[in-house]
Amino acid sequence: MMNQMGMMMQQQGVGVPGGPGGVGGVGMPGPGGVGVAPGMMQSPQMQQAQQQQVQQQQVQQQQVQQQQVQQQQQQVQQQQQQQQQHSQSAQQQAQQTEKVDNISKVKVLVGPLRDALSTTIKTAAQLIQQNTLADAGSKTVDLNNAPRFDKHLEEFYSICDQIELNLKTTKLCMQQCTSSQQYLPIPVATSQPPLPETNALTYNQYLEVVKLQIGYAKDIHDTLICAAQNISPSE
């Protein structure tokens, strides 16, 4: 009977009464000690192993988060680079398609011309004031630190020359366009299939026009030579 009760108590994790250090499952010393089931107690080594596993999982999660953050940063940088490249290409295309005719160049040079004129006038005023004070004897003039009037004046004239050249070129282009419209106002037909324009010249007609223009130029040349010979006749 006692043996059966002891077996039941061992299964339930209860120490067997009587006798010092009775053990039930894992018995506690002393009479009537309460036992603990084998699966309920964990050794310190197992606890350390679990803690290490938890720490490793946390470290892995942190690494994964850092990798995700780095990937996001890289994506943002790539997007910024792509945007910069698109903006640069758009600027280059805009610069290429921008008008580079002489009138546009003149408009661009108006601003620097205004600044150069203002700087030149200010420099001249400063020099006049310094010379006046020096003549009055109230101040000594330091020639090394004096403003360079000649430099600013040269810059002003340089911009004026650029504007003048662009305007002259524009005038010549307009004259050429006017002459072209005057002497050959009708477009020339090529050897391709006939174009829908009804007022286009054929190639034979174009040759006749060219011959007439050559003859006209030759007549002018001969007239000029005769006039030169009449003005200064040879002995």
From Swiss-Prot:
Residues 15-36 have a biased composition (Gly residues). Residues 1-14, 37-54 have a biased composition (Low complexity). It is found in: Nucleus. Keywords: Activator, Nucleus, Transcription, Transcription regulation. GO terms for cellular component: mediator complex. One of its GO terms (biological process) is regulation of transcription by RNA polymerase II. Its main location: nucleus. Pfam families: Med29 (PF11568). Residues 1-54 are annotated as: Disordered. It comes from the Eukaryota. InterPro entries: Mediator_Med29_met (IPR021018). One of its GO terms (molecular function) is transcription coregulator activity. Component of the Mediator complex, a coactivator involved in the regulated transcription of nearly all RNA polymerase II-dependent genes. Mediator functions as a bridge to convey information from gene-specific regulatory proteins to the basal RNA polymerase II transcription machinery. Mediator is recruited to promoters by direct interactions with regulatory proteins and serves as a scaffold for the assembly of a functional preinitiation complex with RNA polymerase II and the general transcription factors. Belongs to the Mediator complex subunit 29 family. PANTHER family: MEDIATOR OF RNA POLYMERASE II TRANSCRIPTION SUBUNIT 29 (PTHR28314:SF1). Component of the Mediator complex. This is Mediator of RNA polymerase II transcription subunit 29. The gene is ix.
